Amino acid sequence: MILFKSPRFTRLYCTFFLLLVLVLTLVGSRIDPARKRTGGALRVVADRVAQLSSRPWSRVGAGDTAEEAHRRAWELARATQYAGTGARVQRFLEKALRGEPFTVAAIGGSVSKGRGLTPPKSAQPEPEGEIHGATTLYSRENLHFLVFDWLNATFPHPNNRFVNGAQGGVGAGYFAWCFKEHIPTDVDLVLVELGINDLNHLRVIAKYELLVRSVLELDSAPAIINIETFTTLFHELISSSALHNDVLAYYDIPSLSIRDVLLPRLMADPDVQMPRWFRTGGDVSLGDDKVREWGGVPVDLMHISAKGHGLAAGLIINYLSTQLALVAPSTPKGLFGRFSAARLRKTLEHVYDIPDTWLTQSFDPTELPERRAPVCRSMNSAKLHNRVSGTDDVPENDQVRGLVLHPSSHGWEPWAWMEKHYLVARKPGALAVFDFVISAPLPATHDDDDDEVIEDPLDVYSAFEGTATRAASVRREMPTRLRLKDQVAARQEQPTRRSSTFRKAHNEGSSDGGTVAIGFQRSANYGLGSVHCWVDEDRTKGRRLDGWWEIKERNMGIVTEVATGLQPGRHRLQCELLADTLDPLKRHEFRLFAIVHN
């Protein structure tokens, strides 16, 4: 019996059975030419499954003992914050299984950049020929590189591509507007890691939703896998991952976290385990607000170590392996079940795809939300754009990188700290002026396939027949449902009713006009000052933005709105450095790194 359970026997048996299927299919196609198309499809899948069966790395845990298999399953279960259907990930794996090249990209902060990891022997240049970002973006210890390395080994193709778009010290508020500045738009799989970058505040929900929804709406229809790291630095262990997870569930995005796998070990022996899983050595020293001493060793509690990266990557790879087992089973029974399962998924997945309504907006199935394309100009992007933001529809000959100041600006200059780039002002009265164009909203879209009447869920439980009840329920006949587009047409003939309670607080998805915001640094350590920003000539409706804050452990880039409700057309944003400052030492420096609008 042990022989029949061994991975080697399973691979041999599977390969033999697939060859038998191919022979029978070829014979059948000679008898019935109509079967040739089916035979071709079977041959492609059979070849790929046979190749996978010969690669020991394609099946995580293929050689595990029973105890190791149980432990591996336990760790994945503890790490899984939301599993979902896996439909998009399976769709990505099916593409790879067909032998097509794929692109994997990463969105994240300094953990994803590889803070403290060993740089690769040669840094990977950007397509434009300039390296923008840390040299550890493509470290062989980086969790995202490790995931791509496994995928590339499992599905080798010379045109497989990995792009690490991580940016240190920013969160979903930045990437929601600017992710296209850092990753390609033809991406197939996006790995997101922002658990310690986003503040633990309800406002994060809307920003995070804008990010994941915008990524899912790319023409390439990518899959997303969310991975959360964690920190023990603050007063509570709970973090923004708690706010991310409801958004991830709403959009059926799998989410994994290393926290609940590591915590039992950290609690059992912190002096030994903390230096193993978090960053040490190098520039880690006491006196840094992110550093605490464990076991006599200074430990950076915001950034996981190379071993921590390996754990995060291993959990993602384990998850991918479980999904691969569904699309490329290693047993004959599973292989044939796969075809019916794939067809069933394709009939169901439109039900669970991108919802017509936002999670952070009021429910109204007859009023589709406006779609506004985010526009970003970032000092940390290598992409070229027209000088006036929002006019890239007609490319100019002298396109530039970063932010372009209007000639009327004064007192601002480019400045960089390592790989982070800013426009900086230090003298009160300095004025930054930017021209930008608000575009008209994109037409609301709706898939006619969604007009089908969806059957009730199967898991609607009823009492067994004969069970005594206090009162019999009365079954009412439900009225015939209008097709959604007919409801929309009927609604347009009625006065518009709109609940604005949440929408006023959720400007990222607002349908009440365009928005403009700026990205700037906040810190308690850098002596940062304040600016007053306004749009066009209405200075009185402007907004004060403070660079200094009280959070000593975080030096972060924040994106904050200046104005909303802007009409389509050309506008002018102005920001003036104020003499008044929150910095205890009365310093004034202000660091601006992005202008975003829609």
Model-derived regions, located:
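Active-site segments of SGNH/GDSL-like serine hydrolases
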Residues: 193-197, 210-245
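Structural recognition of the beta-strand scaffold that forms the well-ordered cores
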Residues: 103-107, 112, 161-166, 188-194, ...
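N-terminal secretory targeting modules
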Residues: 1-107, 111-137, 156-158, 298-598
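Soluble non-cytosolic domains of exported or imported proteins
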Residues: 102, 137-142, 169, 173, ...
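Oxyanion-hole/transition-state-stabilizing segment in secreted/luminal serine hydrolases
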Residues: 105-107, 113, 117-119, 130, ...
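Alpha-helical scaffolding within the catalytic cores
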Residues: 87-92, 148, 172-183, 206-214, ...
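Extracellular serine-dependent O-acyl
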Residues: 30-31, 53, 223-228, 239-295, ...
